[in-house]
Amino acid sequence: MATASGASDLSGSGAPPPGVGAQAAAAAEEEEREVVRVRVKKCESFLPPEFRSFAVDPQITSLDVLQHILIRAFDLSGKKNFGISYLGRDRLGQEVYLSLLSDWDLSTAFATASKPYLQLRVDIRPSEDSPLLEDWDIISPKDVIGSDVLLAEKRSSLTTAALPFTQSILTQVGRTLSKVQQVLSWSYGEDVKPFKPPLSDAEFHTYLNHEGQLSRPEELRLRIYHGGVEPSLRKVVWRYLLNVYPDGLTGRERMDYMKRKSREYEQLKSEWAQRANPEDLEFIRSTVLKDVLRTDRAHPYYAGPEDGPHLRALHDLLTTYAVTHPQVSYCQGMSDLASPILAVMDHEGHAFVCFCGIMKRLAANFHPDGRAMATKFAHLKLLLRHADPDFYQYLQEAGADDLFFCYRWLLLELKREFAFDDALRMLEVTWSSLPPDPPEHEVELVGPPSQVADAGFGGHRGWPVRQRHMLRPAGGGGSTFEDAVDHLATASQGPGGGGRLLRQASLDGLQQLRDNMGSRRDPLVQLPHPAALISSKSLSEPLLNSPDPLLSSFSHPDSPSSSSPPSTQEASPTGDMAVGSPLMQEVGSPKDPGKSLPPVPPMGLPPPQEFGRGNPFMLFLCLAILLEHRDHIMRNGLDYNELAMHFDRLVRKHHLGRVLRRARALFADYLQSEVWDSEEGAEATAAS
């Protein structure tokens, strides 16, 4: 509407507006691409062919959904094996049927062979030819997952007593996934609609009572889990998702609360000099600034000069957090967590309050002992092993089953894996999968003081060695984290060269770590925190897949260590992992990529309240991304370095719709099946 007058002026002069024709053509093509017409021919032995026609939305149709449609369309009922191919052209331009083996193949088919319609062929194979679509059994929406069946099921006491919110998610997810079946009724003239539109302002008010109090917090989260939130409403709703408000506040009380907390933030911001000595404060500020200047600069909110108000607000927010939370301080990656919050809140004080809310849950990710990250790695391995034993075995044989290339995913909860606007939706959906956890009184903006004594750590008075950050020199003895790195150093000097962490594609920070391992470390040199294993050179790159050195004790269970018992299969080199723990059995020493490994037996998964340290859906998002690329990885035989480079190239490029849809289906399958082993969770928690 804003350009209407300009357009009329141009048309009045007799000259068409520049680029209007191209824009109109692009818009028409985009509109046409919203629906792809599909014609399918089923061929089975000597039986006459059968035909079906329907329409799909290419943005929300994955290969899994297409398989489900075809099973229902031809009444295959999962009892027969079949292959899918589409009519395309080979390199010589000849028409030929090309196999559909992955989502990438399907995207290619949509892009190159869908005019005037996509021609598919389904070839029914005899049942003895191959096993029956094992992956489909894992990732497909189940017909029996409908809410009427779920409500009639006999639920375990664990689920009923401890997981009422999870049970609600299960029921609601069942209703949503069953809508996949409605695709069969789509006709050429109908619009393809998403499962749920984003939450609107009008609908949000239905979750509030007449005094403005949130009366249905669980239902609100379930609604957001299905469809996200309208961008204009995020500023309001995210404060609930990040557990900023105490329970029961009215609308007026919420406004007064945020004003008071903002004033508290401004007071804390003015106390930097009182809370940190000049040398440490300058180091914190320079470290934060280095990251801020490389965080989401392509987004309009953070574009512009380096001294712009939004970059300055992000810098001050993170510096204040580091100064007021000495046990956590600042680590690289925190700017990625704060950036979307500030962009949505558009208010420095409000963003700081929300950042404190999310860091209450995520601060452990940045702890120098690495235990939280170790647990998440172990749980992701458990999940992948359970969901796709063949793919897990492939990664074992490739020496990549440590999943260290997923480090960035787990540390930042996948924030960098999607385009900025998609990441906002992914984050709110993930947060909504967690039960409400409002503060009892109010969000604490100041963390506990450091418990580290002055003597023996070489830090300044009242300032712990942790607060000195990253590669900053510091004196004193070793810590749990340093002991773990010592163990890695010992293991990496064993037969066969470097340990599993020391990959050719390692970061410069890991190269420095490798150099330090060549001889006894200088006790005055502080080793980098796992989130800081990135050199200044790589700061302009995506947060690469830096492994947590503590996990070296998982990766080398048979390696000698000065603090570990004599090496046996049952012994735990970390000293705090249970003997015979399945987690220890999962993470072994480096494998010979050329040596075939025995099949991996199935195993249970921790219950939701333990899985992923209480955030199980995030693990299923990671699993969905892995499975999206499974076929490509296995077909091309990617090794560890190639895997890491493959996913680094996909930073901010993953397809959110496909990943969310697959993750929800996998998550619903996990919740319904109750393949839970509390001992697994207990052992993982103890190990972490």
UniProtKB/Swiss-Prot annotation:
GO terms for molecular function: GTPase activator activity. Residues 1-27, 544-606 are annotated as: Disordered. SUPFAM superfamilies: Ypt/Rab-GAP domain of gyp1p. Residues 544-567 have a biased composition (Low complexity). Disulfide bonds: none annotated. GO terms for biological process: autophagy; regulation of autophagosome maturation. Residues 596-606 have a biased composition (Pro residues). The keyword Cell membrane does not apply. The modification Phosphoserine is found at S140, S506. It comes from the Eukaryota. Keywords: Autophagy, Cytoplasm, Cytoplasmic vesicle, GTPase activation, Phosphoprotein. The keyword Cytoplasm applies. The modification Phosphothreonine is found at T160. Signal peptide: none annotated. It is found in: Cytoplasm; Cytoplasmic vesicle, Autophagosome. GO terms for cellular component: autophagosome; cytoplasmic vesicle. Acts as a GTPase-activating protein specific for RAB33B. Involved in the regulation of autophagosome maturation, the process in which autophagosomes fuse with endosomes and lysosomes. Interacts (via N-terminus) with MAP1LC3B, GABARAP and GABARAPL2. This is TBC1 domain family member 25. It comes from Homo sapiens (Human). The gene is TBC1D25.
